[in-house]
């Protein structure tokens, strides 16, 4: 068995599409860049509003994976997603890495990193449906399918659950607290 990567921590932000993971991460990123690394996901989808990722073709993704440039990757919704290997370097250097990942890769991450912190973001179905419609990435039947999709890792425990029906600051501050706790840094007040 390969030795797990540390001494830093990997904060895995998980939750269904439309719960606000990217917004919470952007909020926390602005307030924790000194202690945390937020790698851009590599996705086989063109860039668009509301998601900061590295758009690549299927061929580019496969080549990056074969060259070992991805720490972890997974297929979802007809696309492929990956976290750059810079995550391994940062965790190995003692930093906190924060990434939006699929719940389906949590066991793989637990085997890869010495310290895995799982943050599950949830929101009411009504708010989630509104957010998915506002995003405009898919037609109404696709939104219904997303709302009905079961959890791919129902048995995996979350270390923190953020109910993201409130303000961005409410949820963002909860995520920030998790990141700073993982880094052993104090939460600034005021």
Curated annotation (Swiss-Prot):
Pathway: Metabolic intermediate biosynthesis; 5-phospho-alpha-D-ribose 1-diphosphate biosynthesis; 5-phospho-alpha-D-ribose 1-diphosphate from D-ribose 5-phosphate (route II): step 3/3
Entry keywords, A to Z: ATP-binding, Nucleotide-binding, Transferase
Record's keyword annotation contains Transferase: yes
Catalytic reaction equation(s): alpha-D-ribose 1,5-bisphosphate + ATP = 5-phospho-alpha-D-ribose 1-diphosphate + ADP
TM region(s), chain numbering: none
UniProt xrefs under SUPFAM superfamilies: P-loop containing nucleoside triphosphate hydrolases
Gene Ontology process terms (BP): 5-phosphoribose 1-diphosphate biosynthetic process; organic phosphonate metabolic process
Top-rank lineage group of the source organism: Bacteria
Record GO terms (molecular function): ATP binding; ribose 1,5-bisphosphate phosphokinase activity
Classification via HAMAP family: PhnN
Protein name as catalogued: Ribose 1,5-bisphosphate phosphokinase PhnN
Species: Pseudofrankia inefficax (strain DSM 45817 / CECT 9037 / DDB 130130 / EuI1c) (Frankia inefficax)
